């Protein structure tokens, strides 16, 4: 009675169909029905899932509240079947609860929407998510950073092609259905536990189921706090390594259990034989076993959903630069290292979870074996059922571990293939970089060659500009020379002026001669008059002396008579007349002196004119001398050209009987003939100009400026004919004769000028 009053919930549910089935199974021992989840457990589990959906990791909830939830649900009959209408014979192992018909609304969906996993670590960079529930991602801000990097991130080409594991579609059915292994259940299962839970390569995600109105929607677990027994710290900003690393979201513990609660649940009671505490502990153990079984089912569903991924997420390889390829390779290596660290941490977490499962099973075994008699049969039956289900789950877990190990091997093979491809890509990048460097060197050499060519062209341009400047200066000097050259009218005027000046010069010379003769005559007359003046002066002196003597005599002989006075008066008159004559002669001498001065001035002017004429004649003589030297040089050059022409003609005559010359030599000979013809024409023009200037004629301006008539191009083909060569020789001989005539005329003119200069000097 005490036990019945202490567990009223068990008694109240005795009339339920689940309790009837249990009593029937205990009495008959032939049929077993799978347990069903109680309503209180479902409400508690929905509360846990709501906490998980909100992104909270049971931090705000206290351990006492969770413990009260567990203790309040301990009175409910937790040994009720999940599928109440499925019977399994005793001779076989109990099948999994996931093996029910897919037509049930509560069963897991077979499509990829049953478990919607977002991409881990790539939601920000790639912006791709599975077409599932985006609300779970939005509700938890740390999900995008806490998603696990899948092992097959490196594709076939060594780049990030596919972010989902490449599992065939034929394994999808294997993930969804479970085969019942043919093994019998026993009470002692430590060896099976050690063999099945000792594999550290187990990888699985344990999403938190969220009950809705008609079906259970499985969502991703949020970040949890530090798991009991592990050194990993789960933060909201993403998995940061603490002491033993981070854990993926699928391997986190249930959000409804905190650290204190799990330690309270799994630790043995200090007084196991107290009936009230044993009942609470058994209820918590049963609830924990239900949680483990549900997590295993969810793991199987999750793995079945993970095996089906579309292949349309594999992006094509972009055509990038070598530097971008190198950065991509470095980032891929970094991601592979991070994935290896995550795999190691997941293995550690799996081993810790296996250890916890072993401890929980040992506690359950100890609690069930140490339970007093009132619930012995029911507990033994329930324990056998749980052991059968546990063996089945262990077999499924072994199959899963084998499949995951095979998948790991495939991923390692893909990783090795991707590493080989990365190595090939690196080698190709090295080759391309070498090619680019070689091409860069070639381009630099080309640029240097072009720079040299440009510098040479600049130098040539500078030389040509200097030559053009010199030519421009030459043209300016020629223009000045042409401007200074007199025209025909100016030349005629200058010749007329020269003739007039020569006539004036002759007239002035004649006048000078006349004036010189007149001057000589006047000088002679002046001399005679001076002699006369001297004689007159002497006579005057004699007369003055005689006068004095006469005066003396007069004084002595005043009284000698009047005859003497008459004589004196006559002599005085004679002296006056002589004095007047002398004055007249002096005036005439002054006039003659002034005339001589004017004649001297005119002679000085005439001498200046003669000096200017002499200088002009000297200039003309120097110009004639320069022309003679130029004509001599031209004659020498003409002689050399004639000799060269003759030698070339002889060579051509010698080469014609033998073999015909090459086209290059023929072209050169043709060009030489053309140059000789142009030189011959220039020499003829110079000779004509010099002869015209020597003869006093006006030169031909067209010849002086070098303006030639254009030669007909047909004459270039006739240079090799003997008639043309003979005619050219005659022209050269005529030119030589003209040069000789010019030389003789220049020498005659020079001799004449020299004679005139000597006569004038």
UniProtKB/Swiss-Prot annotation:
Residues 333-656, 723-749 form a coiled coil. Residues 433-475 are annotated as: Required for centrosome localization and for its function in the suppression of centrosome disjunction. It is found in: Cytoplasm, Cytoskeleton, Microtubule organizing center, Centrosome; Cytoplasm, Cytoskeleton, Spindle pole; Nucleus, Nucleolus; Cytoplasm, Cytoskeleton, Microtubule organizing center, Centrosome, Centriole. Residues 14-33 have a biased composition (Polar residues). The keyword Coiled coil applies. Keywords: Chromosome partition, Coiled coil, Cytoplasm, Cytoskeleton, Nucleus, Phosphoprotein. Its main location: cytoplasm. GO terms for molecular function: identical protein binding. InterPro entries: Cep85/Cep85L. Residues 435-454, 462-472 have a biased composition (Basic and acidic residues). GO terms for biological process: centriole replication; chromosome segregation; negative regulation of protein kinase activity; neuron migration; regulation of mitotic centrosome separation. One of its GO terms (cellular component) is cell cortex. Residues 256-432 are annotated as: Mediates interaction with NEK2 and is required for its function in the suppression of centrosome disjunction. The keyword NADP does not apply. The modification Phosphoserine is found at residues 16, 140. Residues 1-33, 95-117, 226-279, 435-472 are annotated as: Disordered. Belongs to the CEP85 family. Homodimer. Interacts with STIL (via N-terminus); this interaction is essential for robust PLK4 activation and efficient centriole assembly and for PLK4-dependent cell migration. Interacts with PLK4; required for CEP85 to be able to drive centriole duplication and cell migration. Acts as a regulator of centriole duplication through a direct interaction with STIL, a key factor involved in the early steps of centriole formation. The CEP85-STIL protein complex acts as a modulator of PLK4-driven cytoskeletal rearrangements and directional cell motility. Acts as a negative regulator of NEK2 to maintain the centrosome integrity in interphase. Suppresses centrosome disjunction by inhibiting NEK2 kinase activity. This is Centrosomal protein of 85 kDa. It comes from Mus musculus. The lineage of its organism: Eukaryota, Metazoa, Chordata, Craniata, Vertebrata.
């Amino acid at each position: 009675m005490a036990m019945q009053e202490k567990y009223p919930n068990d008694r109240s549910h005795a009339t339920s169909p689940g309790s009837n089935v249990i009593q029937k199974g205990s009495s008959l021992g032939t049929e077993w029905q799978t347990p069903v989840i109680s309503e209180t457990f479902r409400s508690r589990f929905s509360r846990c899932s709501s906490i998980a959906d909100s992104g909270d990791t049971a931090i705000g909830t206290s351990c006492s509240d969770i413990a009260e939830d567990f203790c309040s649900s301990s009175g409910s009959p937790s040994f009720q079947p999940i599928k109440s209408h499925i019977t399994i014979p005793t001779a076989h192992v109990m099948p999994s609860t996931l093996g029910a018909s897919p037509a049930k609304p509560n069963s897991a969906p077979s499509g990829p929407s049953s478990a919607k996993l977002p991409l881990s670590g790539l939601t920000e960079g790639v912006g791709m998510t599975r077409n599932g529930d985006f609300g779970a991602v939005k509700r938890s801000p740390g999900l995008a950073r806490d998603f696990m990097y899948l092992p097959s991130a490196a594709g076939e080409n060594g780049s990030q092609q596919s972010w989902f594991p490449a599992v065939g579609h034929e394994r999808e059915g294997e993930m969804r259905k479970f085969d019942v292994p043919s093994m019998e259940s026993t009470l002692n299962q430590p060896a099976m536990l050690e063999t099945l839970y000792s594999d550290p390569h187990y990888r699985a995600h344990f999403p938190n189921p969220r009950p809705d109105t008609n079906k259970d929607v499985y969502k991703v677990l949020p970040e949890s706090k530090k798991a009991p027994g592990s050194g990993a710290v789960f933060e909201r900003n993403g998995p940061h390594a603490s002491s033993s690393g981070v854990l993926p979201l699928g391997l986190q513990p249930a959000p409804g259990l905190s650290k204190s609660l799990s330690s309270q649940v799994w630790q043995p009671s200090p007084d196991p034989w107290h009936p009230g505490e044993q009942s609470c502990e058994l209820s918590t153990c049963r609830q924990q076993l239900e949680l483990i079984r549900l997590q295993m089912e969810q793991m199987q569903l999750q793995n079945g959903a993970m095996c089906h991924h579309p292949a349309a997420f594999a992006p094509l390889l972009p055509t990038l630069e070598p530097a971008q390829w190198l950065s991509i390779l470095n980032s891929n290596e970094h991601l592979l290292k991070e994935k290896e660290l995550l795999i190691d941490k997941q293995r550690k977490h799996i081993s810790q979870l296996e250890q916890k499962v072993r401890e929980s099973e040992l506690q359950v075994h100890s609690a069930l074996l140490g339970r007093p008699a009132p619930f012995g049969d029911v507990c033994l039956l329930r324990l056998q059922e749980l052991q059968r289900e546990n063996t089945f789950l262990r077999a499924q877990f072994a199959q899963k571990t084998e499949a995951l190990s095979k998948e790991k091997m495939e991923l390692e093979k893909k990783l090795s293939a991707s590493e080989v491809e990365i190595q090939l890509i690196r080698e190709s990048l090295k080759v391309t970089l070498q090619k680019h460097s070689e091409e860069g060197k070639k381009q630099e050499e080309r640029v240097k060659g072009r720079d040299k060519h440009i510098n040479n062209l600049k130098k040539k341009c500078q030389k040509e500009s200097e030559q053009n400047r010199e030519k421009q200066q030459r043209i300016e000097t020629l223009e000045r020379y042409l401007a200074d050259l007199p025209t025909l009218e100016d030349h005629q005027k200058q010749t007329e002026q020269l003739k007039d000046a020569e006539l004036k010069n002759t007239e002035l010379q004649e006048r000078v001669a006349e004036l010189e003769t007149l001057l000589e005559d006047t000088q002679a007359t002046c001399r005679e008059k001076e002699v006369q003046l001297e004689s007159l002066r002497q006579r005057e002196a004699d007369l003055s002396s005689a006068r004095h003597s006469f005066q003396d005599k007069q004084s002595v002989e005043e009284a000698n008579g009047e005859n003497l006075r008459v004589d004196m008066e006559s002599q005085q008159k004679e002296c006056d007349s002589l004095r007047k004559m002398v004055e007249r002669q002096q005036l005439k001498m002054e006039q003659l002196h002034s005339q001589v001065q004017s004649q001297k001035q005119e002679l000085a002017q005439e001498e200046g004119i003669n000096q200017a004429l002499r200088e002009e004649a000297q200039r003309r003589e120097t110009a004639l001398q320069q022309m003679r030297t130029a004509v001599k040089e031209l004659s020498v050059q003409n002689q050399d050209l004639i000799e060269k022409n003759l030698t070339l003609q002889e060579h051509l005559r010698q080469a014609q009987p033998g073999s015909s010359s090459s086209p290059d030599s023929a072209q050169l000979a043709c060009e030489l003939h053309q140059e000789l013809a142009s030189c011959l024409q220039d020499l003829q023009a110079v000779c004509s100009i010099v002869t015209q200037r020597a003869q006093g004629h006006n030169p031909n301006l067209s010849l002086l400026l070098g303006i030639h008539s254009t030669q007909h191009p047909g004459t270039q083909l006739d240079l090799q004919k003997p008639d043309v060569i003979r005619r050219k020789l005659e022209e050269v001989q005529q030119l030589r004769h003209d040069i000789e005539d010019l030389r003789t005329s220049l020498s005659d003119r020079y001799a004449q000028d020299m004679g005139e200069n000597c006569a004038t000097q």
